[in-house]
């Protein structure tokens, strides 16, 4: 565990510190690691964690969201930039090099030190680690190496613990303990209220986001800037960086995404840090509000991105609006947006609207230690700007929480500035709309399709000559960071006119925002950074705003190419609530309220929406929203936009469904009038936020599926795809009622409808022959079904029962009266039958004896001599078969069996259970098998009167008993003794084996009967 944490820490932090130095540090962190484990165990469940933090906020007694004035922020940024100037100047010259700056800001009362130590790993992969060190003010500010010493092992350990727990849920809070610092819980995940767009894999986060959708409108909005999609090789920062980044407003949009990072409570420093330039197309994760897209720090350098200390990437238009969600949040977010819009030429306005404990119940954020956001501003085309912006990026804003009076004063200042910003932004938006309309007309006339112009991340800081303003293609890639799978949106060109969502070559060492700026400079004027609130996107040309829940289409998408916005909606819960869409007043002003509200899409977790625009025909942009199960098609004016839905690797089944879905969606466009109704449904469905497999279907990294554009209707149309919800549900097992099945040792046993079905195998076997004579054939035909499944109804069984006949008295009686083998209606009949059978058998024997005496010679000629072994065999078989019937029949006719035992004729299966048959057989065949094999001479005389010699002769006459006969002579056994012999006597006294003894006893029994 330690070694893994070492590797993660060293790789993410960069090669600045060697692994050797980190090992002893990790050994020292064992105590911290244990504490972290305890903290995790205490906060295993998000709801509990949310309550815990809410109580913690209340304990802090922080009344209103305490906002820091822009002036204070700027001063802090200037001081930080001066401190970081020397390392930044060296690295800033290298666009790909990460800025290495450690901000030592000692907070006064909060005693919170936010030190971001940035280490230069390689020109290709740069990491900027943000660590939140909570320490006492008395402790001296940490320098870069110290910060790394504490943060690296701690973050690594926390990540390891998180992995060992195997929890998809991001750590609710991570305790980063300074040696002398008070333990403060940095809340990473719980505050998703502000970050409804945070794409946390855990459903709990989504639930929180749903709860906090009310606050989502207030949450800072990520300007519609294209975030670099993670290169396929890059893995999004997992563990702290993803989870904390979501919880942390730090979510800095990677690669020029105007990084508005909510400084919600920066979770273990690595929260949405985006690799400044090394990211290349560096993967971007959505920031907590889905605003800042965390560049899942796909470190091309091969460093493990898992460490929470992700590289903060300077965002070209990065506005880190730490909007404390409160009543003020809307105004603050608007102000921040305006600041961003105004900051097209100016560097990002760091509005630290850190809300401390806003009473808003939905917000569980503990901003007790108001963490100011550090805004990494992506360096734009020129290295000079890079130096300036990197300085700001490295800005470690130390905001000392003094007195609430000061906070109130700052709040008033912020509100005042926000109003100015809003006014300025509105003006800028109007200008942009006019410019975009002109550009659209020019482009349509030219009919030129820009080949994959990098949709610049509408950074306000990007300074592009307005002459290049013809094409403003903005792609907003909102990629929810799934810890499990890195988002890899390959720049796969899908359709010729449309722009592949990530056209930037991943290999370009230039920082992605810079690349975007360079491309923009060539063909496009980046519109002032239009902050798109979590749900709203402003499409200036058509005054149509799509409020894609988190899936924010890049504002000012009016490029003739159309919106190349791969919108990977973060949490579907961010559900596109119409109020949230309207919450972005500046962005949505242009849009009629109905359209703006109507165009809210509940983003789907897994799906990346790439909206591609053809140069001429206007096609509805259909955004798949599996969570809301709505496809929203937006028509950008005069621009063909095809929505290519890219899906992260999830299931091939979903892929299969996509082709069908792609064909269906464009045809379903419904007039915009439906939008209000549909929106309400969306809001209800969005809360459910269960992505439908059929809607999510695109193979990961697979070619974008361009839905056929329907050029006709310009107004946005909403297509209900909810009907496929039923199709996507797995078929449920159909259980037959009232039939229980058991699988026992491989046998499938079904219980019958009745407890004890009358028809059973023994009953069938015993009653088949007698019943065939007197019963209708239907009885036997229907019986087999009874034992099998109880299929035959009870009525039919009752009919059968009425047909049962007693074998003795011949009466018909219901089956309930027939006990045991179902042969006799009562015990009396059974006993009488046994007695009568035995009596008749004796009479038969007497008659047979007389007949034999009368025809001695004839019997001698006709009766074939039968060996004693055959007779014994018949006897044994009779016993065996009779034993089987006795067990099934019961005790009612056991006496009858004993009566038949002496002369059971061969295998009893022949007699079919009827004494009458036996009598008939013995009468018609006087020489029964028992009599065969015995010399008729011995039968003619009385055995009880035999002498020893006669007994000797009798035994000698039996087959194979010549030797045994001598033993009888020696024992002086005469006729009477012979009749008394049993097998035990023969075996014990004479040492005769069991086989011969049984045979002899069988013959003796025959003599007894005669």
Curated annotation (Swiss-Prot):
Zinc finger spans (FCS-type)? 797-831
Q: Which residues are annotated with the PTM Phosphoserine?
A: 651, 904
This protein's UniProt keywords: Developmental protein, DNA-binding, Isopeptide bond, Metal-binding, Nucleus, Phosphoprotein, Ubl conjugation, Zinc, Zinc-finger
Q: Where in the cell is it found?
A: Nucleus
Q: Where is the composition biased (Low complexity)?
A: 1-22, 464-480, 575-587
Compositional bias of type Gly residues: which residue ranges?
279-292
Upregulation details from the record are: By retinoic acid.
Q: GO CC terms for this protein?
A: nuclear body; nucleus; PRC1 complex; sex chromatin
Task: Note the PANTHER family from the entry.
Answer: POLYCOMB GROUP PROTEIN, POLYHOMEOTIC-LIKE PROTEIN 1
State the name under which the record lists this protein.
Polyhomeotic-like protein 1
Organism this protein belongs to: Mus musculus
